[in-house]
Amino acid sequence: MRPLRHGLSRATSPKGRGKSTAGSFLITPNTLATSLTAWLPLRGKTSPALGEDVTVGDKRGNLARERLRGFYTMNFLLTLAYDGTNYCGFQVQPNGRSVAATFQDALEAVLGSRPDIKGCSRTDAGVHALGFRLNFHADTRIPPQKLPLALNQHLPPDIRVLAAQTVPEDFHARYAAHTKTYLYRIHNHPIDSPFDAAYYTRVPRRLDEAAMQAAAQQFVGTHDFLALCAAGSSAAAHGDTVRTITDCHVTRRGDEVDIEVTADGYLYNMVRILAGTLCEVGAGRLRAADIPAILASRDRSRAGPTLPAKGLFLKCVDYPEKEEQP
């Protein structure tokens, strides 16, 4: 283990007891516990137990929390993929199986503790994820590159940790996000596939993807998206309905039509309503030219239907590069 270097105003020298030093000296695991009572500002405590949290001041005046047994509190950022079919959503719910609670069970099995986790999004029941990001603080010697394998051994097959890294102490997976990208999958065929019907919405009528693409471009930019917001949204209640979509496009591969949206944030059911509106355009019931008027109306009834959750995937979350630097 690398020794810790701290600046102390008064300290016991590790090379000679009774000598007082100023500035900095090295603290090794062997001397840390035995010399602790001589120099740690324990706020009234005289002899902390091994493994107890203590506060140590460094020479810049910052406070660093460390465990006596040599553990360090680190902020971990993980990337997850999950099948949302059997979950009530990501967020912990009082009556229902959530992705967050299931993940915390695995954390407790691996770390011996149950840290709070901060998810990048509150995906709804039945929504899937290809690149969900979450972070948590934990005291552990397990290096981040070994966390995926360790956690996956305790997770059900429909949740997988894909990657892990450390990030700055104040990093928050939700608030630090720059953009989030969602994918909505449509099976454009009269007959369902027996293999992956849980991962798309079937639209039997042939869709005009070129018209849908033209309409998708009307959503790009900064707009008030209240017309694409489901009832019960707290953002709508507070008048916070302006968002910026940086990319929105429609592609077809055979019978599969994909709608991909990237934005700085979303309203409740916004992507599912946007996808439903584009399907109305693809079916000829709306035109691309109607989209600006629908947005300007701020009227939910003028937009398309809310498509089912099962076709929606959180594809990826992007952060400013400096935010992900440990």
PLM-predicted stretches and their roles:
Residues 23-39, 43, 61, 65-68:
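N-terminal, intrinsically disordered charge-dense segments
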Residues 70-326:
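Structured-RNA-binding interfaces characteristic of tRNA pseudouridine synthases
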Residues 13-14, 64:
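Flexible loop/turn and low-complexity linker elements, especially glycine-anchored beta turns
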